[in-house]
Amino acid sequence: MAATMMSKTIISSKQCSKPIAPPKVSINKGFVNTSAAIKNREMMVWQPFNNKMFETFSYLPPLTDEQISKQVDYILANAWTPCLEFAASDQAYAGNENCITMGPVASTYQDNRYWTMWKLPMFGCTDGSQVLTEIQACTKAFPDAYIRLVCFDANRQVQISGFLVHRPPSATDYRLPADRQV
């Protein structure tokens, strides 16, 4: 088995050492070969400026109310506890400036950022409309803040998921998917 794995590794490294040929687009009986176009798209460069992401679904355009509702239904169907959190634009991203330190000791929170909780976690919530009502109330109270919905699993005692439900209108750190690569 080790010999088989070694031979596969050698073969794949030989294939990778070949120079990259320019893409070819061929038309055969009215059909266009798009594999070259796909390969070119895969080789694009990630835009590093004003292209920040948040947790789950960050690569997608902002979610609509209907899409958020479906996610909330999924959260409730799995008996997870939804919770809303919000943060100002300058405190929303992970970084040392947002990390709470006490001398040489730093917080051990997973991504060095704390968001303020909107009310309490929604224990016992059974209806997605309750969560959507709270999202609207939080958005009305803090229109220039990032608002995310996180959910917790009481059995495993961990955060299961988190995603943005509101991005401030003044945010300039987001790019549409078509503009994320150079």
Swiss-Prot record:
Pfam families: RuBisCO_small (PF00101). It is found in: Plastid, Chloroplast. Signal peptide: none annotated. It comes from the Eukaryota. Residues 1-41 form a transit peptide. GO terms for cellular component: chloroplast. Keywords: Calvin cycle, Carbon dioxide fixation, Chloroplast, Photorespiration, Photosynthesis, Plastid, Transit peptide. GO terms for molecular function: ribulose-bisphosphate carboxylase activity. The keyword Plastid applies. One of its GO terms (biological process) is reductive pentose-phosphate cycle. Heterohexadecamer of 8 large and 8 small subunits. RuBisCO catalyzes two reactions: the carboxylation of D-ribulose 1,5-bisphosphate, the primary event in carbon dioxide fixation, as well as the oxidative fragmentation of the pentose substrate. Both reactions occur simultaneously and in competition at the same active site. Although the small subunit is not catalytic it is essential for maximal activity. HAMAP family: RuBisCO_S_bact. The basic functional RuBisCO is composed of a large chain homodimer in a 'head-to-tail' conformation. In form I RuBisCO this homodimer is arranged in a barrel-like tetramer with the small subunits forming a tetrameric 'cap' on each end of the 'barrel'. PANTHER family: RIBULOSE BISPHOSPHATE CARBOXYLASE SMALL CHAIN 1, CHLOROPLASTIC, RIBULOSE BISPHOSPHATE CARBOXYLASE SMALL SUBUNIT, CHLOROPLASTIC 1. Belongs to the RuBisCO small chain family. This is Ribulose bisphosphate carboxylase small subunit, chloroplastic 6.
